[in-house]
């Protein structure tokens, strides 16, 4: 089935649409109908064939390729969103609500105005919605998001010195666990493996597969191995990327010495799976927060 891939916000989720017979290419803007209404989207994937089982049905058609008039309306909407953000801030203050406004967004047809916010708990914003509806004369939706979504919208610089992955290119948040940091021999200090959002860094997922494969070729620290020169010893440390192993071997005079070998020069039993890890309370809380955060609520289009 032929489809195109469309995003509605930077680094947002990609949605499939039916291009019909239109000559739509990557980089174009299109007008499509979504569950939220008529939307203006950016084509990030040109026409291509996708297996039908991978498509969420019903597949909606592209209404049209965006015209200069559509581009102008979209720019006007962005200006209106900035004004709406300021008004909403004033209304939140007026109602004394303990919530942090993050972003505002108009649908292309102006039939709905969405406000994204964070808060520690549930917020009764019914009176606020009535107040906003009276001002903007359109449907109002207030959507509570998590700290990861907040960071995705706001952007920032990671400890690597680069723009945040979630703000730059990540469409969706992948599950991240402390085990990934452990596999990569990283410090388990929460301040070292947490991102700007205070959750585990998304980039821990990037090299998970490679480290898992490399680790499976190595013995565990504490395992006993036999070296190529016939010595038997205990593994002191391993270098995952270099595939080197430091072994405490016993020499003929019963003296002990630390020698370094490439993993191919050692014989040992297959690596034991060590899923159980000692975690302090801070790490455990970080892991629980990851599970509690759940999926993103930015792209419920």
Per-region residue spans from a language model:
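Conserved glycine-centered short motifs in functionally critical loops
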Residues: 156, 160-226, 233-236
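Mixed-charge, low-complexity intrinsically disordered segments
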Residues: 236-237, 271
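Intrinsically disordered, low-complexity linker and terminal regions at domain boundaries
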Residues: 258-301
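Short, basic/aromatic beta-hairpin or loop at an interaction surface
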Residues: 1-14, 193-206, 253
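Basic/aromatic-rich interaction segments and small domains that mediate binding to polyanionic partners
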Residues: 239-260
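Acidic-enriched and Gly/Ser
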Residues: 1-187
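A generic structural signal for residues embedded in beta-strands
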Residues: 32, 226-228
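Short beta-strand segments
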Residues: 13-15, 39-41, 231-233, 256-261
